[in-house]
Curated annotation (Swiss-Prot):
Protein family per UniProt: Belongs to the NAD synthetase family.
Function per UniProt: Catalyzes the ATP-dependent amidation of deamido-NAD to form NAD. Uses ammonia as a nitrogen source.
HAMAP family per UniProt: NadE_ammonia_dep
GO biological process entries: NAD biosynthetic process
Pathway: Cofactor biosynthesis; NAD(+) biosynthesis; NAD(+) from deamido-NAD(+) (ammonia route): step 1/1
Keywords for the protein's UniProt record, in alphabetical order: ATP-binding, Ligase, Magnesium, Metal-binding, NAD, Nucleotide-binding
Metal-binding keyword on record: yes
Annotated signal sequence range: none
SUBUNIT field: Homodimer.
Protein name: NH(3)-dependent NAD(+) synthetase
Chain residues that bind Mg(2+): 37, 139
Residues involved in ATP binding: 31-38, 134, 163, 185
Length: 248
């Protein structure tokens, strides 16, 4: 890990601790997916809030690799953890909303993310905790998250870190190799991977946003499209002009 990244991490940890204290929260909660991003956030919270942290593994058709990865994380990092079975409410919602998960993959997948969000915030309210997001800079920049799903959080610690930074931090925090080596995925449906959906690798995107790589015309168009079409995800809800003199 570079000295610059280590200094950033130290500042981030001090800022996060102070933010939680100033919010008068008792601790933090993190959704644990088995991916490297959530692993790094979980490891950081274990360090900063050893007693007052909670990680949730929320089961909705989770893969065997998801199970192995989250189990390894909880055991190796000694995380406070709760397992939550969201399969019954997920099935009930599919039926109530007449969603066919085989024909409407993204609709059903985003429903999973929003159910997990509701679970995280319910536990946060129960314990007076803040919800920590796990998205990195690439995901936020390209809108690679579910609006009001995994994009919903109180604090986003990794928002200005590239994927390569996250991998470096995973080594620093002694994240299990199983987690580090697996292909990044949002786990919204079987076989999904981040890079296949984005159309570029994280390495390419890291280099591009640092100004070290010129993309092909096709890939540049893909990045431009993803950024433009996801702008609404990075903005507050649109409002009309005020009727009165006071502001929100």
């Amino acid at each position: 890990m570079t000295k610059n990244l280590l200094n950033y991490l130290n500042e981030l940890e001090a800022w996060l601790t102070n933010y939680v204290n100033e919010a008068h929260a008792q601790g933090v909660v993190v959704g644990l997916s088995g991916g490297v991003d959530s692993a790094v956030v979980a490891a950081m919270t274990k360090k900063l809030f050893p007693q007052n942290h909670l990680t949730l593994v929320m089961h909705i058709n989770n893969s065997e690799l998801d199970h192995k990865a989250t189990t390894a994380l909880v055991e190796q990092l000694q995380l406070n953890n709760k397992q939550v079975d969201l399969e019954p409410p997920y099935r009930a919602m599919l039926q109530a909303l007449t969603i066919d998960p085989q024909k409407e993959l993204m609709v059903a997948g985003n429903l999973k993310a929003r159910l997990r969000m509701a679970c995280l915030y319910t536990h946060a309210q129960k314990h007076n905790y803040l919800v920590l997001g796990t998205g990195n800079f690439i995901e936020y920049s390209l809108g690679y998250f579910t609006k009001w799903g995994d994009g919903a959080c109180d604090v986003a610690p990794l928002a200005f870190l590239l994927k390569s930074d996250v991998y470096a931090l995973s080594q620093h925090f002694n994240v299990p190799e199983l987690v580090i080596e697996r292909a990044p995925t949002a786990s919204l449906f079987a076989g999904q991977t981040d890079e296949a959906e984005m159309g570029l690798t994280y390495k390419e995107l890291d280099q591009y946003f640092q100004g070290h790589l010129q993309l092909s015309a096709t890939k540049q168009q893909r990045v431009d499209h993803l950024r433009q079409s996801s702008q609404h995800k990075r903005s507050l809800p649109k409002t009309f002009k005020p009727l009165y003199s006071f502001q929100i």
